[in-house]
Amino acid sequence: MIVDKLLDDSRGGEGLLDAAGDCGLMTSPLNLAYFYGASPPAAAPGACDGGCSASGPSAPGSPGSDSSDFSSASSVSSCGAVESRPRGGARAERLQVEPHMGVVRQQRGPFQGVRVKNSVKELLLHIRSHKQKASGQAVDDFKTQSVNREQFTELKNTVSYSGKRKGSDSLSDGPACKRSALLHTQFLTPPQTPTPAESMEDVHHNESKQDSCADLLQNIINIKNECSPVSLNTVQVSWMSPGEVPQGSPHEQCQDLHRGQVFSPPQKYQPFQVSSSPHMMDQASMYQYSPQNQSVQPPPQHYTHNPALEYSPYSRTSQSPSYEPHLFGREPQFCPDQSFAPLLSDPRQSENIAVPPQTAPSVQQQIDTHLQNFSLMPPDTCEALARPDASSTPLSTPLPFPNLGGNPMSTTQLGKSFFQWQVEQEENKLANISQDQFLSKDADGDTFLHIAVAQGRRALSYVLARKMNALHMLDIKEHNGQSAFQVAVAANQHLIVQDLVTLGAQVNTTDCWGRTPLHVCAEKGHSQVLQAIQKGAAGSNQFVDLEATNYDGLTPLHCAVLAHNAVVHELQRNQQPHSPEVQELLLKNKSLVDTIKCLIQMGAAVEAKDRKSGRTALHLAAEEANLELIRLFLELPSCLSFVNAKAYNGNTALHVAASLQYRVTQLDAVRLLMRKGADPSTRNLENEQPVHLVPDGPVGEQIRRILKGKSIQQRAPPY
């Protein structure tokens, strides 16, 4: 132990180690035996006697005890005993001993302690700064024995970082005791060499031993390179049987240490591989599948003969209960060399026939084509594969399967529609109905056909209409004078309407109000029914009277315009644009516009006049300032023929539009008529021009200016 603290002796006493400090022969402060042996003959005994007399009972009896068996630990404890005694007693005893030994010391100043500067002190200070609590005697033993124990990190950590030892442990003569090493299963590799960081920390320890460390490090590296590292994450699995020896050199297989899988070199896809084991060839063939994208070889599966796993080409039925459907992408393990013809002719024999497993040679084929276009191989293909040139035989011959349904369906049955099937069912139900029952009516005069049509039962209506048409009673009417065809039109059943017209229903029949089916369609806005009537009438060679009038003298086009005017009027009055009522009115507005367009497309005349007032459709649209319909009519090619048409009172459409009050679109309607050719100078039967019918007010003033042509020139486009 190094004595590094200052001893402040006010009495002028000097320590025992002053003489030793003067000699300058101490090479190691931990090996005191070497210090006593190298001291002068006159000073060593005296110093020893002085030290011995001052140490008391715990000190050795004579200097002769500093032999080879005198440990450094006892020397350190003796020095500690000398320092712990009172300074006065130590000085008195030394003064008595020195005259007796005949030694005269030179008087010096106050004692300042012993300071030794060498690499060992710096090393110990470095160890203390890094919290290495190793004892001094252990370091001395390692130094004197010249044993290099810094090569292995585990042993260094055990010696250096084991903590401060107790007093009883310091008295040991040998090296420090090692802790019992724990069994770590993860350390399956040779001990690792010191890292660069550890070498930087222990640079003072390894300066004198670089050569030996380099040799040891090279030996460890050589040992580590010779042995193949194996970790617990590595899984080496041999799928071969115990009796088989795997073929191939170690270079043909590479181990994936991270995933623990054994990979084979990339090769082409082989759907069938023959096992190299002779005894396995007799039992079953080895099946091995190796996709190209993963290059992983799963274990070849060995199949033995099992009646429950026999192959059968039929589906799971009572005739072949042993069939189990193979998984997607799995190939057939067996390739029978006998024909499937007996099985196809007699399915009951499939239970008693055992297909012997055979081995097929390797066939080169792409994996995608094999998985997607997979087909079972017939026996002729298996025979071809059994030949030596089977590697070039494609697996493209499909296996014919019998009809599993048992009852083959004819072409007519396959082409039957659902409606035809429903008609057959209804005919079977009405097979026992008499003619009187077909023609019977209820209290309202409705027959079975009227009720079926109102309910929308198309198949039943078709069967009833066909039976009643055979009796020439298809147009029989109920109490309102409506036939079944008119009921279907009012119910918006366009499919039933087309069926009835095809069977021969009259399209121009009228009800008790003089309305034809076209009037009903125009009033309700059933544009699809109009198209069905047109199509059915063309098929049955019937004439559709588009100019037929009801008892009010209105044609279907007039009725449609009046219905649309009512919707426009309601829309102008309603101030809530997003209310449900407004949404319903908008839908009805659209359907009515479509109906009017359909009527015009069918050939309805816009210039046709009603029977009571002589008004045209343009007059009716001008009465409500219906800009949408006015624009629709005036965009027709024949608009000039009816734009100035007069009613029975002599009024034109411009007279009607100019005389309106409290209409939002009145100004726009008058302007539109003037632009499309309306004559503002036309007079009615009362000799009135449109300007004479304009009401007073700010809107009237603007209308007058438009009628006089002043604002027309200002608003005219530049072209």
Curated annotation (Swiss-Prot):
GO CC entries: cytoplasmic ribonucleoprotein granule; nuclear speck; nucleus
Any single GO BP term: mRNA transcription by RNA polymerase II
Compositional bias of kind Basic and acidic residues: 84-97, 201-210
Short sequence motif named Nuclear localization signal, residue ranges: 164-179
Low complexity biased stretches: 46-81
Repeat region (ANK), residues: 444-473, 480-509, 513-542, 552-581, 583-608, 613-642, 649-682
PROSITE patterns, A to Z: ANK_REP_REGION (PS50297), ANK_REPEAT (PS50088), OCA (PS52003)
Segments of this protein annotated with the region Required for transcriptional activity: 322-394
Places the protein is found: Nucleus
Protein name in the entry: NF-kappa-B inhibitor zeta
